[in-house]
């Protein structure tokens, strides 16, 4: 059984396009999911949180409009992990993208050397 790569993307995001092209060029099949319409689940977010050693800020799109308009730079340090995860699961714009899951592995953002180790 081959684990399918789940890639949450936003179609107008350059980084997401680069990531998709990278996967295509390397012959890696993946399921593309629109992050705004279908944000990652609480379960997936918690799994990713474990991968990033509990650093919830790493899961946030800190350069996004919603992050700034919700003043999360100030609020996030005082927020409970559960509340932060709920926020992410209810607003795909807040999630760092691409948000990628393969079985129990995962990664946010696109970094070619990291992806090479994980997926090739």
Language-model regions, residue ranges each:
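Residue-level detector of intrinsically disordered terminal segments
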Residues: 1-2, 47
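A structure-centric signal for secondary-structure junctions around beta-strands
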Residues: 2-4, 95-96
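Local sequence-structure signature of Cys/Sec-based thiol-disulfide redox active-site neighborhoods
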Residues: 3-26, 30-35
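Thiol/selenol-based redox catalytic cores and closely related redox-interacting motifs
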Residues: 37-120
């Amino acid at each position: 059984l081959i684990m399918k790569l789940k890639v949450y993307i936003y179609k107008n995001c350059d980084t997401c396009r680069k990531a998709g092209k990278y996967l295509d060029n390397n012959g890696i099949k993946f399921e593309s999911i629109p992050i705004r319409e279908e944000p990652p689940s609480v379960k997936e977010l918690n799994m990713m949180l474990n991968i990033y050693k509990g650093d919830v800020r790493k899961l946030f799109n800190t350069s996004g409009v919603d992050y700034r308009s919700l003043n999360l730079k100030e609020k996030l340090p005082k927020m409970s992990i559960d509340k932060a995860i709920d926020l992410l699961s209810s607003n795909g714009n807040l999630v760092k993208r691409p948000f990628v899951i393969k079985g129990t592995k995962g990664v946010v953002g696109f970094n070619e050397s990291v992806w090479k180790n994980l997926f090739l």
